From Swiss-Prot:
Gene field: recO
Upper lineage: Bacteria, Bacillati, Bacillota, Bacilli, Bacillales
HAMAP family in UniProt: RecO
GO biological process, any: DNA recombination
UniProt key word DNA damage: yes
InterPro entries: ARFGAP/RecO, DNA_rep/recomb_RecO_N, NA-bd_OB-fold, RecO, RecO_C
Organism: Bacillus velezensis (strain DSM 23117 / BGSC 10A6 / LMG 26770 / FZB42)
Top-level division of the source organism's lineage: Bacteria
Protein name: DNA repair protein RecO
Record carries keyword DNA damage: yes
């Protein structure tokens, strides 16, 4: 059956000498894989529309297994991302997290809009750390993970100083600190931002400027939580961490 839909290219894998298997995130059908015959040839009409992170309109032959991509039309190329090594690292991480954190053929229009908006924001110059934090927090619910971010996991108080208890799955207040000696310290601002990123509509995001210290705290909480609960190993995460270390080193040398 021929189907036309909009999609985001999450991943491509070479298949044979001339073909690609393209993994698309679509609004109507969720995550699907399609064979793009001849897409490895530079002159192929499918080559341009099977680039990572591209947002396009696709005509495909759908089957119960791997579909076949017939044609495509670019809507947004996300060219700025692909031409910047640092932005590519962030986008590749978001794409792999989306790919490995979702099941095939399970439509989720909310997730589609989240990933599309995150790539648009990366392409337009929004702080990539902030975009990545938002996607990571919102992907938790997609994967069935629901940390308690509104009050203390023990006494249920919504007031006080909060740290994060990885073991107990959420915020822990100063009155209950002794119940988890391995809790992760964080500032009140970090606690507010974790909650904000979890609930906030990324489409409403304005200009955000975070201190590196705050970013480091957020990153530590999210990384530890994913390590404990997600069950995911993402190759792109290691690459992104290496790129961030390189960027921080370059920034230090400039100053």
């Amino acid at each position: 059956m021929l189907t036309k839909c909009e999609g985001i290219v999450l991943r491509t894998n070479d298949y044979g000498e001339t073909n690609k298997i393209v993994t698309l995130l679509t609004r109507e059908h969720g995550k699907i894989g399609v064979m793009a015959r001849g897409a490895r040839k530079s002159a192929s009409r499918l080559s341009a529309v099977s680039q990572p992170f591209l947002y396009g309109s696709f005509l495909m032959q759908r089957t119960s297994g791997l579909g076949t991509l017939q044609q495509g039309e670019m809507i947004l190329s996300m060219r700025t991302i692909r031409e910047d090594l640092f932005l590519t690292a962030y986008a590749a991480f978001i794409a792999e997290l989306t790919d490995k954190g979702t099941e095939e053929k399970k439509p989720n229009p909310y997730l589609f809009e989240l990933i599309l908006e995150s790539f648009k924001r990366l392409n337009d110059g929004t702080d990539p750390d902030v975009i990545t934090f938002i996607v990571q927090m919102k992907m938790l619910g997609v994967m069935g993970l629901y940390p308690e971010l509104n009050h203390c996991v023990h006494c249920k108080s919504g007031e006080g100083t909060f740290h994060f208890s990885i073991r107990d799955n959420g915020f822990i207040c100063h009155r209950c600190f002794e119940k988890d000696p391995y809790r992760v310290p964080m500032s009140p601002q970090t606690a507010r931002l974790l909650r904000l990123f979890y609930y906030f509509d990324i489409g409403r995001l304005g200009s955000v400027s975070l201190k590196q210290e705050t970013k480091n705290e957020i990153k530590r909480v999210i990384d530890l939580y994913y390590e404990e609960y997600s069950g995911l190993y993402l190759k792109s995460k290691r690459f992104l961490d290496q790129m961030e270390s390189m960027k921080n080193l370059l920034d230090e040398n400039k100053s």
